[in-house]
Amino acid sequence: MRTEPDRKSSYGRSMTQTQQAQKILVTGATGTVGRQVVAELLARGHTVRALTRDPATADFPAGVEVVRGDLTDPDSLVPALVGVTGVHLITFGGAYFAPLETGPRILELARAAGVRRVTVLHGGEATPLEQAVRADGRVDWTVIMPVEFMGNALEWADGIVTAGEVREPFVSRLSAMVHEGDIGAVAAVALTEEGHGSQEYVITGPELLTVGDKVATIAAARGRDIALVELTEEEAVAQWRAAGHPEDVIGFLLEAYGNTPEVGRTVADTVEKVTGRPARTFGQWAAEHADTFRAG
């Protein structure tokens, strides 16, 4: 059941006021969300151990302990789990990011290592790992359920820089898109503070935006107008195929854009309740990435 954080708890307080530094294992640490979880934990004074299949190519901030491991091979996680109090888990793994079938074993190893808290990044479906975590009564679990990432707008960068335009279908669709840093912040609090066990946290931004709103915001941030070209479904499919998207991804995009679920177009105040500060706006995100949308 989705729940809202308790307003009476100590969310948003600094670590020094509420607890000692903890050691947290972050899986998917090189991913969009994982990197934000790492950064937020470090900012809060915790020790971070980052799991990756190839430590030699991983690039993390100073102070992060990088360890080798593969979620599709649970026993490879045993050294990484030693001494950690919490684990941030993704539910997909391997070269093709298939749903992890190893979830029950991963959870078993985490419990045996003394892990007290886990966060699970929801991937749009109930995977074996998420199901195992939800069914377990021996660790405090929090399912992190973000809506559309603000970072998805980076897919427009090439078209904006080269042609000064964005070509999209369903331009009136609404989205409560979320800053990835806010996802990381919520996960970091849930991993290190009391009161977040057995919770589902839907994480959104603070506003509803159309495609036109997003384009106008990016234009303001980069200081130059951007044309918005609305595509028909057929034109969009052709564009996605030309970009190399598989047919199942194209089907997903058509459904997600043409029939956005209510949860994706409803603003939730989870970020502020959990972290003690408002969710970041798309304007803030656009300002952070303005140079990406500028030529040269």
Predicted region positions:
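Cofactor-binding loops of NAD(P)H-dependent oxidoreductases
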Residues: G69
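Oxidoreductase cofactor-interface core, primarily capturing Rossmann-like NAD(P)-dependent enzymes
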Residues: R2, S10, T16-A62, T72-V84, ...
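A hydrophobic C-terminal alpha-helical subdomain
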Residues: E4-G12, E233-G296
